[in-house]
Every structure is written in structure tokens, then in C-alpha cells.
């Protein structure tokens, strides 16, 4: 939910005439998609100028940055003149490149099992790693396990942070429901919009948030349950929570799933969650240089789950 929550907040603040930069990941079709500035995706020339500036700053050390670190610094160069910068974390928490910057506010979407090889093997370990970077003002999704909420409150107390749990202001309820009905939002996008509205309210006021919501257009973000042609959806979800969101969206239907994932993802749990709505899995084979894809593993798991599986051609 990080991407859509961040983009909703970005669009809300844009509606109040703020200059906003939004950094997100992953991208679908073009690297440029990660950089949203002034209501549009950054163009090649803007990225090239930002890259030249980074080379001037880092010199030879630029080669030492990871892919995500490089992209994060590129975003900060691009967004220098913005009123607000919305940074989407990668793995999240103390090991994330976005955490090195001073923050006005943190937003914690629902915390689940992802990046366990970096963040920890238990939900509490993962949550602790993410919540350690809590800013003086923080907002956390109310869709958390109780032990995660308890931990968040404990860390907020120790850091003397102002932590709020997301809820929809009754002042916004009618306009919110009209918007959700107009754009037929699935459950997960409704929840992420609520979170963004609360963040906007914290940053501005309830009156300004209502004004922004009344002007809000459809979510402008690639790959978040995005219908790119009739009955053809693209989604970047890559963990069990995202799979559950897809179950809610396509409940009672059968889909042909064109799929692949990195080998370090919880593929069994993802496909097991999606099983009730899958007719066939088609594996999209893509050459990945840095991280191994799970082609053979998907065949094996699909066989165990009794799901028909073949190569996408």
C-alpha cells in the first residue's frame, strides 16, 4: 500500500497548489515512472540533468551506490524545489536509503512479512526494524496486528513522537464515499486513501483536506491493480498481503495469472492465497542480471497446489 498511499497524498497536496515530488518503486515500463514531479512522470532530460549533478557530487563514489540508493539520491536532486517530498521506502526501516533524510512525518502502511532476509524472521522483528525510524510525527495504518500497534506505541513513547492511528474523519465521510463509488475503489485502495487523507489532515487541516478530496481525480499510478485494457490488469504486488488484496478485488472470478517473482519472495504463500481465483498461471520469463527469478520454483509450487502452469508466449 506504500505506492498508492503516497500517490493519493501527493495528488491531494497538489490540489492545494503545493509543488510535490513523489518517489516510488518498482516501475513497470520505464525507470522514469519512479519520479513523479508537478503532476507528471519525470522526462529523460530531467533525469539526465539530475544524473550529471549526482556525478559532480559523488564523483567516483557514485559507482559504489546500490541501484535503489542511486535512484533515491536522483529523486532528491529532482525534487529540490518542492514544497513536499513524498518518499516511498524500499525494504523500509533503518536499512532503507530513504531513512537517511530528515523527515517531517512517517506514514506506516500495514506491516507484514516481506524482505525477511533483511528485516527479520518474525512479524515483531520486521515491525521493530521499520518502526525504529519513526519521525517526531507519525501515522500508522489501523490495519495492523495488535502486537505491531502495541510496539508502535511503545517506540513512540520512547522517542517522544506524536503517533496517530489512521481513522476517517466524519467531516470527510460523505465526500469520501462519493469518491469511492465514482471510481469503484477496491477495499485496499479505500483503506490507502483513508490513510492519505489522515496524513493530509495532519499536514494541513480538515477543511483543506476536504477541499483537496473534492478535487481528487483517479489514482495516477502505474501498476496498482491498473486496468490497462478491458479485463487486463497490471499489479506490482509481491507479498501475501498484496495477494489478499487481489482476492478481495476478484472474488468469485477466475483469472489467468501472468506471473514471475524473485526467488527470495514468499511464492508459495502468494500463490496459495491466490489459488481460489486462479484458472491458469503463465510464467513470464525475463532475463534478470542481479537477482534470480523463480521460474522453476513456480512450476514446482503450482504443481503442489494443483494449479495449471505453463510458459507465457
Residue spans for each PLM region:
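Beta-strand->loop->alpha-helix junctions that form or flank phosphate-binding loops
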Residues: 23-25, 140-144, 155-173, 185-187, ...
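Nucleotide phosphate-binding/pyrophosphate-handling subdomain across enzymes
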Residues: 84-89, 96-107, 111-115, 125, ...
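Conserved catalytic-core segment of NTP-binding enzymes
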Residues: 90-94, 102-160, 269
Amino acid at each position: 500500500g506504500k505506492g498508492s498511499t503516497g500517490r493519493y497524498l501527493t495528488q491531494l497536496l497538489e490540489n492545494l497548489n503545493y509543488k510535490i515530488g513523489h518517489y516510488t518503486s518498482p516501475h513497470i515500463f520505464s525507470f522514469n515512472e519512479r519520479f513523479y514531479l508537478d503532476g507528471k512522470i519525470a522526462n529523460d532530460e530531467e533525469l539526465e540533468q539530475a544524473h550529471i549533478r549526482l556525478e559532480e557530487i559523488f564523483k567516483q563514489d557514485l559507482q559504489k551506490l546500490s541501484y535503489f540508493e542511486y535512484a533515491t539520491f536522483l529523486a532528491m536532486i529532482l525534487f529540490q524545489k518542492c514544497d513536499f517530498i513524498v518518499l516511498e521506502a524500499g525494504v523500509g526501516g533503518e536499512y532503507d536509503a530513504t531513512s537517511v533524510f530528515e523527515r517531517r512525518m512517517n506514514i506506516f502502511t500495514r506491516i507484514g512479512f516481506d524482505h525477511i532476509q533483511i528485516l527479520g524472521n518474525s512479524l515483531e522483528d520486521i515491525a521493530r526494524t521499520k518502526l525504529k525510524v519513526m519521525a517526531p510525527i507519525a501515522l500508522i495504518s489501523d490495519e495492523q496486528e495488535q502486537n505491531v500497534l502495541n510496539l508502535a506505541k511503545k517506540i513512540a513513547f520512547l522517542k517522544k513522537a506524536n503517533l496517530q492511528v489512521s481513522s476517517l474523519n466524519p467531516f470527510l465521510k460523505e465526500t469520501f464515499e462519493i469518491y469511492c463509488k465514482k471510481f469503484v475503489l477496491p477495499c485496499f485502495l479505500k483503506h490507502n486513501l483513508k490513510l492519505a487523507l489522515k496524513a493530509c489532515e495532519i499536514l494541513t487541516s480538515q477543511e483543506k483536506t476536504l477541499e483537496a478530496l473534492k478535487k481528487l481525480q483517479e489514482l495516477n499510478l502505474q501498476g496498482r491493480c491498473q486496468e490497462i485494457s478491458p479485463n487486463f490488469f497490471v499489479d506490482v504486488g509481491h507479498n501475501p498481503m498484496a495477494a489478499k488484496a487481489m482476492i478481495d478485488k476478484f472474488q468469485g472470478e477466475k483469472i489467468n495469472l501472468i506471473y514471475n517473482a524473485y526467488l527470495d519472495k514468499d511464492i508459495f504463500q502468494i500463490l496459495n492465497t491466490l489459488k481460489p481465483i486462479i484458472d491458469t498461471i503463465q510464467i513470464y520469463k525475463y532475463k534478470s542480471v542481479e537477482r534470480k527469478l523463480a521460474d522453476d520454483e513456480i512450476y514446482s509450487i503450482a504443481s503442489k497446489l494443483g494449479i495449471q502452469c505453463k510458459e507465457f508466449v
